Amino acid sequence: MLDFITWTADPAIFSIGSREIRWYGLAFAIGFLIGYKIVEKMWKREKLNPAWIDSLLIYTMLGTVIGARLGHCLFYAPDYYLANPLEILKVWEGGLASHGGTLGIIIAIYFYSKRVSHRSMLWAFDKLVVPTGLVAAMIRLGNLMNHEIYGHPTDLPWGFRFIENLHAWKRGAAPVFTVPSHPTQLYEAASYLVTFAICMWLYSVSYTHLRAHETLMNL
């Protein structure tokens, strides 16, 4: 009988010199690309100004990355990053906080609504909320590959043992494993996919039958 799962996935897909190309970054990019295509299809269906969608992508990406990075730096290690502000720019070294990204998106959509669409923030969020679950699921799979954001210890057979000393392990040291823990990355990814499916259905219903603005955000 399986007692636990020993997770030894390498966070990096490959390296170019000293720079690693990581699964997390790939998952993040794929999530955004698929999300963009979903919103693009919604845009065409509703016959909206095509110039607005490219601006929405730019505002959303900037809000997500800047907010997530600042959230990590200021929420988790403010003393270090305030003393070394240039380190904040090193996004490629890792360190993104989802709650910071959420706040960044809200701020970005505020400016998008004021400067581009000239519609309410809820109108923009009504478009973004549909693929958000899918994007979030991809990011959580990236967290799984990074051996991070796992849950409490468990004796359930699907508990994961993650590598604690990733940097040393990458340099050739023997891996040091956590105790078997809940793979909360997978739990969250599954819940986000369910949320995505529900939002897709709600959008289809609201567009086909209700023709109402901001229906999803009101729900």
Protein language model regions, located:
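Cytosolic catalytic cores of cyclic-nucleotide second-messenger enzymes
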Residues: 219
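A feature for loop-to-transmembrane-helix boundaries and adjacent hydrophobic helices
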Residues: 1-216
